[in-house]
């Protein structure tokens, strides 16, 4: 069994608990669907938020999705001038037999600008929304 990393990010419109949890769930569900893994396959998950987000821990969203036995870790991004604001980033490490090249990284909403080189077309997403 190999350990592989899956990256993702999403932006929120405001620093409030409900939106942070909702958008984090959206990203987690998308990453799980696109990479077709089971919760039992997850080694650990890291969440980071930009310094302007402090109303909630993104890991709470994972616990609400029944990831309660997965090691979860929240952290704050470094405050780089000019970086994308109100952004939640995720790194999920999973056990699988896939190659790293087969991992589908998902960058949603305003975060689509971050890593166009890693993005795959998300199922059901229009091509115009992807770019």
Give the role of each language-model region.
Residues 1-131:
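Terminal domain-initiation and capping elements
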């Amino acid at each position: 069994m190999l350990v592989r990393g899956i990256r993702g990010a999403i932006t929120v419109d405001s620093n409030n608990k409900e939106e942070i949890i909702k958008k984090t769930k959206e990203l987690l569900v998308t990453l799980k669907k696109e990479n077709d893994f089971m919760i039992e396959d997850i080694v650990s998950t890291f969440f980071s938020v930009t310094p302007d987000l402090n109303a909630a821990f993104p890991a709470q969203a994972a616990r609400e999705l029944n990831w309660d036995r997965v090691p979860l870790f929240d952290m704050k991004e470094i405050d780089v001038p000019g970086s994308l604001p109100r952004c939640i980033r995720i790194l999920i490490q999973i056990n699988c037999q896939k190659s790293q090249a087969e991992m589908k990284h998902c960058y949603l909403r305003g975060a689509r600008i971050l890593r166009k080189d890693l993005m795959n077309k998300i199922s059901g997403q229009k091509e115009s929304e992807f770019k």
